[in-house]
Amino acid sequence: MSRRNAPKKRPISSDPIYRSRLVSMVISHILKNGKKSLAHRILYQAMKNIEEKTEKDPLKILQQAVLNATPLVEVKARRIGGSTYQVPREVKPERGTALALRWLLSSARKRPGRDMASKLTNELLDAANEVGNAIRKREETHRMAEANKAFSHYRF
């Protein structure tokens, strides 16, 4: 790891259709092998599907899904005196959002089905309703932090 200064955060530009930074972040997380136009198509199709199914603003549902999947605490391994402890720590907002997006997309990819747009639609709707694999992952992370609360004095 570099001992120099931490790199500056690049500003995330908002997407052209929804004018939202969150949508741009989701597109960047969907991205595989540099095919950004495909990532755009997948997300916009998923948003259209959400609007057809719920007749609500898809951006609000996306925001709710990400908010519900965002963890507040996580555990980090810390080696002390020959044994490794799982030390709970708070999650910064940027990291929480990144984790939520990662979990939502990995859960969507694992779902059965043909196209990614429909799988992403179902995962986002489930997460907005506080069910689904991404929510389960967040709950599991919170349980781990709660179980290892005794080691919280080993700060980083």
Curated annotation (Swiss-Prot):
Its main location: plastid. It comes from the Eukaryota. GO terms for cellular component: chloroplast; small ribosomal subunit. Keywords: Chloroplast, Plastid, Ribonucleoprotein, Ribosomal protein, RNA-binding, rRNA-binding. InterPro entries: Ribosomal_uS7 (IPR000235), Ribosomal_uS7_bac/org-type (IPR005717), Ribosomal_uS7_CS (IPR020606), Ribosomal_uS7_dom (IPR023798), Ribosomal_uS7_dom_sf (IPR036823). One of its GO terms (molecular function) is rRNA binding. It is found in: Plastid, Chloroplast. GO terms for biological process: translation. Signal peptide: none annotated. Part of the 30S ribosomal subunit. This is Small ribosomal subunit protein uS7c. The gene is rps7.
